[in-house]
Curated annotation (Swiss-Prot):
Gene3D superfamilies: MOB kinase activator (1.20.140.30). Belongs to the MOB1/phocein family. This is MOB-like protein phocein. Pfam families: Mob1_phocein.
Amino acid sequence: MVMAEGTAVLRRNRPGTKAQDFYNWPDESFEEMDSTLAVQQYIQQNIRADCSNIDKILEPPEGQDEGVWKYEHLRQFCLELNGLAVKLQSECHPDTCTQMTATEQWIFLCAAHKTPKECPAIDYTRHTLDGAACLLNSNKYFPSRVSIKESSVAKLGSVCRRIYRIFSHAYFHHRQIFDEYENETFLCHRFTKFVMKYNLMSKDNLIVPILEEEVQNSVSGGE
């Protein structure tokens, strides 16, 4: 897209824009982004450029507040997980996936109810993403997207643990859908590296074998 000198670039998909023309505007450096949504825009720009370049996507700009950086990444993970949830609806039905499970070792209770209880997996997925959206959009805990209190940042770990169960259920029970979406987005790879980088989850709870795959690939690549 070539713009005349001095002409402002509208960084917005207008109503009626065709899918192939989405985001058809020049990239900006982080320093040029002057809105309160700059961190979100920067993350999304890097994802669009190359979603497989996870190290680049997770590398914060110099001087970036770490709490805001983690918060904006978690918002982005929830946005993209909605895409996986839509695909799961084609075969993850309440009568076939009656509980939210991954391996046979655990049955996850849904925290969306007054008293946590079992939910069909697809309902658990919807409830979890809705609950995460409510928390991350809460003016009580996250009134600003420029600075975040440490007490609010501490809540991000519990959100990570809950939404990770969507990945694990998809991997162990809907592998074809998981693989297709992962090949398109590298979302579980990115999430796994993200929570490990910022110690938001215990390695023991990361049961989708992303880390093992990377070790195997690095070993085979060095042979």
